Amino acid sequence: CYDVAHYLSEKDCGSYIVTSGGELLKFIDKKKVKIIKLPVHSKNPLIIFINFLALICVILINNISIVHARSRAPAWSCLLAAKITGRKFVTTFHGTYNFNSKIKKFYNSVMVRSDLIIAGSNFIFSHIKENYAKYLDAKKKLLVIFRGINVDYFDSTTKLDSDEKKLLKEWQIEKDKKIILLPGRLTGWKGQEIFIEAINLVNIELGYEAFFAVILGSDQGRDLYKKKLIRLTEQHRLVNQVKFIDHCKDMALAYKVSDVVVSASIEPEAF
């Protein structure tokens, strides 16, 4: 989101981000992109309605022509505000969004009620066609736009040895051992349990002193799941080898210091 906002600014297009806050705010150039704080994270119907009214003001005051939403709760506010003001509405559908009831599916459907629907992958494109076909019509455009990366940021040659040493010190890891990294928030479908089981098998082959495994990601309040993972490492006697790191502000550096980076997801990734 902030990459697109900066790009638009560089092309002399006014760019605004409405947000309730977050870690990425510190990376936004406030001279190029205007930040507007609203409680758009809330799923409370009353707050969604208040946000809708506030967005009407934001759109009209700043003469905004395109409204883009990436999450369901704010998308409802954006949909209503765009309709009232006659602006184009775009959504990025970037998750499968569980639906166990008709009410939940209706709530999710806001992501396909826009003028243009962006699917983050072929998998998500198929998911939309299979599950939300009745909300699609000839007037709506659905296309796949793969998520890009900042190749300059992820250029390993720009990382200093001193930065690597500092990160390893923070992680309490000695670089004389191989590092196996599993990045991603702590949630069952990301495959952390399978990763730990696999690390145990590697241990049997290589020995306990051969490497460190780093599980990098926040539990986002899933305390019980994290405790389950810790118990699993204890069960396999991996406590001294498997490290849980909540957050890393420089993921490019995390990849650089790692010898192997693992994706262990047990369900299709949205991107």
Task: List each model region and its residues.
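N-terminal strand-loop element at the rim of the active site
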Residues: 5-46, 129, 134-141, 221
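Glycosyltransferase donor-sugar binding loop
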Residues: 17-23, 149, 183, 212-227
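Active-site donor-binding acidic/aromatic loop of nucleotide-activated sugar
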Residues: 221-226, 238-248, 254
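Short His-centered aromatic/hydrophobic patch
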Residues: 69-75, 93
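A conserved mid-protein helix/loop that constitutes part of the nucleotide-sugar donor-binding site
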Residues: 2-3, 178-204, 227, 269
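A conserved, positively charged/aromatic
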Residues: 83, 89-122, 126, 136
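A short helix/loop element that forms part of the nucleotide-sugar donor recognition site in Leloir-type
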Residues: 133, 155-173, 228-230
